[in-house]
Amino acid sequence: GTAGVGGVAGVGGDPIADLVDKVRTEVDPAFVYEYEQTKFVPPAGKTLLIVGQTLEEITEYTASFPNEPAPGGWAAYWGIPSTDGLANTAVNEHGSSQNHQELVDRFPNTVLQSALWMVGMWDVAKDTGRGVHDDVIRGFSAWAKTISRPIYLRIGYEFDGPHNELEPSEYVTAYRRFVDITREEGVHNVAFVWHSYAAPPYKGYALASWYPGDEYVDWVAVSLFGHLYGPDPGANANAVFDFAKAHRKPMMIAEASPSLGIFDGDLHSWNTWFVNYFSLAYERNIKAITFINADWKQYWWLVPPDWQDARLQNNETVAKAWFMETAKDRYLKQSPQLFEQLGFAP
């Protein structure tokens, strides 16, 4: 049972509480373990809530729900070979904007979940590994030291995705070089996130072949889209959870969305996707969860043709259920206590 606004679910007939009550809150004890070599992990029984992933989407989200609490973190993107999108606004050819510093300035007492594009094509990863882009890494380091808040950095996100064409050896070399330089530069507010596509991998390489090593990885992450239209996220995702457990790393859902859409007057997205999203976070003791509040039709060049508009503001009932679930103390949101809860001392 879930205590919701208006009393306990099912009592007094609160339809929103009834939706929230569908979430399975049991925790698999196998996924409760001590973490080693990590940073900025929420306390036991807590999970960091993050929303993304463009300036436009984040602005729309906050404008759509002005009276709801802000999440504990915001998701943003940038990419080698440039620091554009960190301290300035970078706009892509499709009109989406990124600016990490703007998120810092607009939302005190929140963290950043930052995705670093570093692919195999055009020798991006290879060049990074051989020092061509050291100035970019140093530029990131200099900027990171100015913001005094946690950054969860996904280096070469979805490293095993066929769309990124990353050879494991080139990826590992580039990833390690990035981390080594940030450490040399005295950066202490960045947690390094190793983020799997959680789907059939590039060239069938083994997951472990992309692993830079325990001393280089603070968190392990997955993307979960269509995976969550059922109670089990699938063999590839499960392998990542098992890998994180074997290496004693906390887990993050770094990207997630009910990609088939959220529609007005239709609770299908809640019942078939959101229930599984939250339930998996409980079951696997996932320490950070990200939600992408996006209209995927705007990403037509990037995503499968069946991906739809999956923004919470499309359905008032689904949005209310989202905010009732995430209102629980379990979810770390924007607050003056957040950094302390994450073990971060500015």
Tell where the protein language model's regions lie, with residue ranges:
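Substrate-binding cleft of extracellular glycoside hydrolase catalytic domains
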Residues: 77-200, 307-314, 326, 334-345
